[in-house]
């Protein structure tokens, strides 16, 4: 471990974060989707944080919804991006 990592702590790697999110989704799928999708608020907050790094977006313009169509659950993410040049 480097001196800087010891002083400032190590930042979680993107791959590790993605792995944790995927594990959460797989666990939800294996449980049969019973109950409400408890992870949606956390997922929406993570999306807002990541998108805000690259685009100035209103948090209210990011919607995350989980729908069931036949035997398939569909995770829908709608993001209203600001218009440029106006």
Swiss-Prot record:
Keyword flag Cell division:
yes
For biological process, the GO terms are: cell division; regulation of division septum assembly
**Record flagged with keyword Cell division:** yes
The record's listing under InterPro entries reads: MinE, MinE_sf
Alphabetical UniProt keywords:
Cell cycle, Cell division
Query: What domain of life is recorded for the organism?
Result: Bacteria
Sum up the protein's function in the record's words: Prevents the cell division inhibition by proteins MinC and MinD at internal division sites while permitting inhibition at polar sites. This ensures cell division at the proper site by restricting the formation of a division septum at the midpoint of the long axis of the cell.
**Entry-linked NCBIfam families:** minE (TIGR01215), PRK00296.1 (NF001422), PRK13989.1 (NF010595)
The UniProt similarity line reads: Belongs to the MinE family.
Annotated protein name in UniProt? Cell division topological specificity factor
Give the organism, scientific name: Azoarcus sp. (strain BH72)
Which gene is this protein's source? minE
């Amino acid at each position: 471990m480097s001196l800087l990592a010891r002083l400032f702590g190590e930042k979680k790697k993107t791959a590790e974060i993605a792995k944790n999110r995927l594990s959460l989704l797989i666990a939800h799928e294996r449980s049969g989707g019973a109950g409400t999708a408890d992870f949606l608020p956390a997922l929406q907050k993570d999306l807002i944080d990541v998108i805000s790094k690259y685009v100035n977006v209103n948090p209210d313009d990011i919607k995350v919804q989980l729908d069931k169509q036949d035997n398939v659950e569909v995770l829908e993410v709608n993001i209203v991006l600001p218009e440029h040049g106006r």
